[in-house]
């Protein structure tokens, strides 16, 4: 029995706060995309793993975070360019919409402030603080964290995840994005299915199969004008492959990728195809936590979570 996972990196402005020149269109699209994706998931009753930046769950802060061991200047944009942009720094309204959705989504972590765990400047102290603060805020919302999505897929400090009671993380995709990925998957007929596995820390690595917005710009416009949306075709192919096998197809995106209506159409086409295949076959839709329980069993995550709070 094959399965499909969809994970989202829910970050608003935090996904770009460390960049010298953040992409304005995507920064401004975060709230819109969040709401559109929730509506589409509810329409097709498809659960997903939403990895949320913990800072979004705050109502207010001083913009300094003096007790947080981040590198110098890490929170500067909060006090400068975005000092008057609460809509980019906070999102308790959006998180409430997520948690109150009729669809059974998984609430997961994307760190507290979009820290890049694989970078040299992210030392163990910083990584621990990012996880601890995220868990504390989640607990204030009566939520727990089973899954973690590394900001920018920059993997590091996996031992910290295990110590903090996390059971699963999204691993890197074995396939490539963009034109090269389309070539590999179509011309070379390379499988997009992935195999989750327990790593040396007892965490379940749930690798990504496909970034749903890896083929954009002029190339996308040309492709759509003479053929169709290549990413929709690839996603359908991956879903169909999972339907025929016992494999896992794992798609991911950011809400801020939905900058225009054509992006909404892409997601509607993919989700409607997934819903049809799920209805007609024994294909299942899972969250990352579901996969972790299936692969490692429910006891391992419970034991880690208990140990981390003791």
At which residue positions do the language-model features occur?
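Catalytic alpha-helical scaffold of carbohydrate-active enzymes acting on polysaccharides/glycoconjugates
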Residues: 1-204, 228-251, 259-310
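Active-site clefts of carbohydrate-active enzymes
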Residues: 203-221, 254-256
């Amino acid at each position: 029995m094959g399965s499909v996972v969809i994970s989202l990196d829910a970050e608003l402005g935090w996904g770009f706060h460390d960049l010298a020149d953040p992409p304005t269109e995507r920064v401004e699209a975060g709230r819109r995309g969040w709401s559109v994706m929730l509506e589409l998931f509810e329409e097709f009753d498809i659960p997903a793993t939403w990895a949320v930046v913990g800072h979004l769950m705050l109502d207010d802060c001083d913009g300094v975070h003096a007790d947080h061991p981040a590198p110098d200047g890490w929170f500067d944009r909060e006090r400068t360019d975005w000092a008057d942009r609460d809509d980019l720094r906070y999102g308790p309204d959006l998180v409430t919409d997520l948690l109150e959705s009729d669809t059974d989504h998984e609430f997961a972590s994307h760190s507290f402030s979009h820290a890049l765990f694989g970078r040299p400047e992210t030392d163990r102290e910083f990584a621990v603080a990012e996880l601890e603060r995220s868990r504390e805020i989640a607990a204030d919302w009566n939520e727990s964290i089973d899954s973690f999505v590394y900001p920018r897929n920059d993997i590091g400090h996996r031992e910290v995840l295990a110590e903090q009671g996390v059971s699963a993380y999204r691993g890197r995709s074995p396939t490539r994005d963009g034109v090269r990925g389309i070539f590999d998957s179509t011309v070379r007929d390379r499988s997009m299915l992935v195999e989750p596995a327990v790593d040396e820390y007892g965490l379940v690595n749930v690798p990504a199969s496909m970034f749903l917005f890896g083929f954009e710009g002029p190339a996308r416009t040309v492709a759509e004008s003479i053929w169709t949306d290549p990413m929709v075709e690839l996603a359908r192919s991956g879903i169909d492959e999972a339907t025929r096998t016992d494999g896992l197809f794992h798609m991911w995106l950011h809400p801020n990728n939905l900058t225009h209506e054509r992006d909404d159409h892409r997601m509607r086409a993919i989700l409607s195809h997934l819903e049809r295949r799920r209805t007609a076959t024994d294909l299942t839709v899972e969250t990352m936590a579901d996969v972790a329980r299936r692969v490692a069993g429910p006891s391992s995550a419970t034991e880690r979570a208990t140990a981390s709070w003791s």
